[in-house]
Amino acid sequence: LTSGTASGKTEAAFLPILTLLAAKPATSIGILYIGPTKALINDQFYRLQGLLEQANIPVWSWHGDVPQNQKQRLLRNPQGILQITPESLEGLLINRSEQLTALFQDLRFVIIDEVHVFMGSDRGQQILCQLARLRRHTQAEPRRVGLSATLGDYASAQRWLAAGSERSVLAPRVGTSGQRLRLSLEHFVRPEAEPESAADDPYYRYLFEQTRGRKCLIFANRRSETEAAVAALRQIAADLGYPDIYHVHHGSIAPTLREAAELAMRDPYLPAVTAATITLELGIDLGQLESIIQLDAPHSVMSFLQRLGRSGRRGGPQEMRMISSEPEAEGSGLVPLPWQLLQSIAIIELYLQDRWLEPVEPPRYPYSLLYHQTMSTLLAAGELQPAQLAHQVLTLPPFKQISQDDYRLLLKHLLAIDHLERLETGSLIIGLAGAKVVGNWRFFAVFQDSDEYSVHDSTKEIGSISSEPAIGDLLTLAGATWEVREVDSQQKRVLVEAAPGRAASFWSGKSVNIHDRVLQQLRQILVESTAEYRYLRPGALARLRQARAWAKQQQLERRQVIPWGGNLFCVFPWCGSISFRTLERVLRLHGQDKLGIRNVIGFAPYYLLVQTEGGSTQQLEQGLTQLSRQTHSGTQLLAPHEEPRLHKFDEFIPGQLLRKGFVG
């Protein structure tokens, strides 16, 4: 079921299922609901409680915040609905393996919320493994229901939902209701030197005016941007005598402060402004929002649509005010193009004109997940013969492309590094080194997590940071500035007190892939189109005109390489992140021999600065064209001894498989 945010998908899925369950109660848990976050599960929990008051169908949540006595009640008398995250479900499969049949033998339905979040991700592949493992404990094949507000590739979603199941999939198309859409996009060129007061920064002053006295959600792509925005808004509000209505919501904010932000947003009588990352992109009910603010370009059309869908509830128009920015390029050596502005327009146009959303492509060789499910399966079973282990693991849906030879190589490696141990009977058990990995609660998750430092003041936890600060450092967290007073490196605990001014954040971010189609649309907007889009505000329109004039001057409509002074050239591949990184890798590994390239600096996924030993622009462009058309084998994309470690458990995978997985 796919339909816009707050359009009733949850009720549409649950009401007929609950009717069936009420008519013929299950003898175990009847419905398994899998959601991406504890917050969404808690939100659904309260909504379902109201639906089920008269039906005598209990609703249970199972995650780290649920009291142990509540879990014991479910184990003693399993029935009704169980709401759970993939990580908690993994823990259930491992730690309650002997009770799984009693818990799930009469499981009728599996409901997976926010399907688009899971598809193509490690967590989504983990869910497919979990459902296949659960099937060994159920009397019949449970029916699966997927819910999503943003879905572009129905065929991929149907394949994903049906993986490992013999059931067919229906995907009813819901017509659009003709909901009105309000968009605006403004742009700012920001000086290198930050003004002393946020009120003197036109960017933040504009943001303040757009949110003043309103119920607004500000989305940013990085935690540091949410912190900087709220710190600036609070400073401006204090200077002008306005109340502090500002909150921050992301994964490194303490749960109590996140809940306070959610409550403030739900209050129908008072204004509130919360800056968030993906944590509020999902379907938590925040009540009637007046507007969504997006800082800089979203990474995908799917993210744009998901964030836009947070507004326009209860029949009102959907509204998003986008604000892009760029640093002053003069004298910096950077290409003077407003990439965030151009990417914002490209994403808007791909949705408005084509209703296009990014397709989902699961990994071909998910070796990190293979390690995880091998250890999880063996931990749950206690011991297994190698053939039994191989059968139980390699029959899981994500591992169809994994050969017996590859799996044999993995098992030999795990024996060699003591993650597995072989008994005299030939059976395999978890080894001493492996026990240290699987014995940590972090093992339940297949996504990368950082070992963060918790930050406290004298009364409460504020949140966490990803690197250790020094005493006296200033840091921004929860939209406020703090001075570090004490650091306990062993306990990873930081004590702070409030401080004036603004400061840096202590997080490291990771890059997100942008699709080829977005960059192709960006090029079309820059060098082919003359359209002046109605949603552009004066600053954005003026900057777009300047960018087009510069692109025309550089003849970018017919050239992809332009001189950049001396033996330095600027290359515009006009391709997405994965293709860009592949080209960059080819140039680094083979550009010296074939094109005389001495150095490559990538500004992914927009342009490359290439330094050569000599030659003309035309020669370099011809050489790059020939090089990019050649078919490069996997080994040609890797340095001789390179073993890329990109996923959580890659450090336990033999190098031969890491290389194969990287190029696969």
Predicted regions, residues:
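Conserved SF1/SF2 helicase motif Ia
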Residues: 19-44, 137-141
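Conserved interdomain linker/interface between the two RecA-like ATPase lobes of SF2 helicase motors
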Residues: 132, 143-222
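Conserved strand-helix element at the start of the C-terminal RecA-like helicase core
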Residues: 30-44, 146, 208-236
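Conserved helicase ATPase core of P-loop NTP-dependent helicases/translocases
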Residues: 69-72, 251-277
